[in-house]
Structure formats: C-alpha cells, structure tokens
C-alpha cells in the first residue's frame, strides 16, 4: 500500500512537471540584428543564423541594432515608429534633433493622436499614456509637461511656450514642487 502511494506520488510529480512545462516556451536569445546593404543603401533585419527576416528596403533606417521585443525604424511617409516582431506599428516615436527621441532615465517620448506620452526603453511598452501637448525627457525621475502649450518657431528651431507647466513622476502622477 505504501509502495503504491509512492508510485502514484511520483507519477503525479512527473505529470505535473510535464504539464507545467507545456505552453511555456523556453526563452532563448531570440533576437534580430540590423544589417545594411551597402550596394543598395538599404537596411533590414536578420536572425542569428543570417537569414533575412525583415528584408532590406522595407524601412528607410533601422535605429534599433538588436531587435528583441520592439524596434525603432524610419517608415517612409510615416516617420519614426516603434514596431513589434510581427512588424505592427505600435506608435510613433517623438522626433527630436533629426532622429527618434533618445531614452532618458529609462523612458522615451512617443506620440499618439498628436499627444505625447512615454514608453519604457527596455520593453517598448507605453508607461504613461499620451496626454501632453508638450513633454520634456525624464531626468532624475521626473519630467516637465503641459497639457496646454504652443509651439513658437524660430526658423530652424522651435520652443514650447506654456503658462501651465508641471512635473510628473514615472507613473504619470503630478509632483508637487
């Protein structure tokens, strides 16, 4: 009787281990690497074995050299965008200084419906929904933002003007200063 209980217990453990492993693929270094075709002056992405996954020329420029979960690319007639592994456009990336916004304090700015929000630089996930007319990069855990501002252009450069600036933390909550 004790022997049967032990055998049944071992069977249960074995069954549980097999069941627990189903549907949970083992995480590997599944990433893509950007490449540049010098003869055609075009960019694309290859896997670790050199197989072309995203053909060169599909995007004008690939800003993300190692494509894990998302990549920032320049899409013709669309601008700087974040795409996922299925090449779905996740959102537009805020344009800054002739390129996509740079990560600052782990976040970068993104745009949706002409409003600015913030995405996580590691995962590409939107952390603060787009709601600001003007938003500066995060520094030391806070960012200066406004929901009512105007853009004043000075030829090549422009500045944001607002009487309603305030600061937010990395969760999007207003900080009292």
Q: How should these model regions be labeled?
A:
Residues 1-28:
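Bacterial Sec-dependent N-terminal signal peptides
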Residues 24-177:
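Residue-level detector of conserved, function-critical positions
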